Amino acid sequence: MSVALVTSVSANIADLAALTVPNKLEYCLRHGYSLICDNQPYDQAVARVDLLCHYLDRFDMLWTLDCDAVITDMRQPIHEFACIGPHVTVCEEGIVSWNRLNCGSMVWRDTTKARALLQTISEERNRWVGLRCGWQTLLGELASVGVDVLTVAPLRAFNSCVWNRPANARDEVGGHWQQGDFVYHPCGVFPMEERTEWLKSILTQVKR
């Protein structure tokens, strides 16, 4: 199976990318995957996810992983995870009750339905641009009605979020990253300087 890890980088997060991209490269080299660092503004990367279809022309599976996420267990190949569904897989988030999913770590198989979802997200921007978390919120709504293209993996399956904001978002459901988890994703840590420091710390705890 051919697999590519795709991460979005840009000049305004160069310091963050310099910290996290080597972690992703190490993981890909270990498991025979390709690493794609797509250099484009974040807003464009979010709006034009249909461009991922070009990578699906070459790879059987894409793992899209945010720049501010790192792999904390190098031993596990993503394509062997039992929770990965037949088309598109995303994890539950666990930070706040109104946001079910976190799209910072997603797996896309090369299927007609996965490609169609990517096209729909980009072509129907008006459906999600005003939502609280953009098309992440849209996918949460689709998951709630049970669309077969989307598989929702359990909390922390391959995306363990970390947060210090909002202050009232307590870890009441066990969503926070824990020792032994696969991915550390401090998407809710602010300001960005603090997020960087947290990442530096966690990179000393990576299991190999």
Predicted regions and their residues:
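N-terminal anchoring/stem segment of glycosyltransferases
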Residues: 1-59, 112, 190-191, 207-208
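GT-A fold catalytic core of metal-dependent nucleotide-sugar glycosyltransferases
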Residues: 41-118
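Hydrophobic/aromatic beta-strand patches that form the interior of the parallel beta-sheet core
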Residues: 6, 36, 63-65, 89-90, ...
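Short coil/turn segments at beta-strand junctions that form active-site/ligand-binding loops
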Residues: 1, 59-61, 149, 180
